[in-house]
Design a protein with these regions (language model features):
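RNA pseudouridine synthases
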Residues: 1-140, 144-150, 154
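Short beta-strand segments enriched for Tyr within beta-sheet-rich domains
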Residues: 87, 163-166
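Beta-rich strand-turn-strand
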Residues: 154, 160-164
Length: 166
């Protein structure tokens, strides 16, 4: 199967590679491209597939973290098992700091704050998450208002925990 032509091709265009080492590659993931394979045929293109085309010598697990399909951003990918283990440990120890920038409809009056909720998978509406104070896992996100543009607010979100779809 060929990579989806709607996206910049990570496998062929060097412009999407931000940094390349012997063990780790940093790439820009466009929105609407999966990080890893899906079992749905309409989503056969993904970053992992493209990386394996570009770096056929890469071994072992490659993706120590993911970005949601709708999210664009930077991915740190491992090209060998040792690098994967090292990156995974950094994510597990929360040594990696992530920031997501979003533009919200409406005006957010708070300059900064945090949100603490208990989240779990919504089994009837995967891959969505729901708030569940009994069975959910703690999720903590800090946010900062970066500015107002018309009727929209630019906000930086910094997840402290690493919950799916946090």
């Amino acid at each position: 199967m060929e990579p989806d032509p709607r996206h910049a091709d990570i496998a062929e265009q060097r412009g999407d590679t931000r940094m390349l080492g012997t063990s780790i590659v940093i790439v820009d993931k466009p929105a609407w491209l999966l990080t890893t394979p899906s079992n749905r045929p309409e989503y056969n293109d993904n970053v992992l597939k493209r990386i394996k085309i570009r770096f056929p010598w890469a071994q072992g697990p490659i993706t120590p973290h993911r970005l949601d399909m709708a999210t664009s951003g930077v991915l740190a990918l491992a090209l060998n098992p040792q690098a994967h283990r090292h990156l995974s440990q950094q994510f597990a120890k929360r040594e990696v700091h992530k920031t997501y920038i979003a533009i919200l409809d409406g005006i957010l009056s708070n300059r900064r704050g945090s949100v603490r909720l208990s989240l779990r998978g919504d089994f009837s509406n995967r891959p969505r998450q729901i708030v569940d104070s009994i069975h959910g896992k703690a999720a903590h996100t800090r946010y900062e208002n970066l500015g107002i543009e018309g009727e929209k607010t630019r906000v930086a979100f910094r997840p402290i925990t690493g919950r799916t779809h946090q």
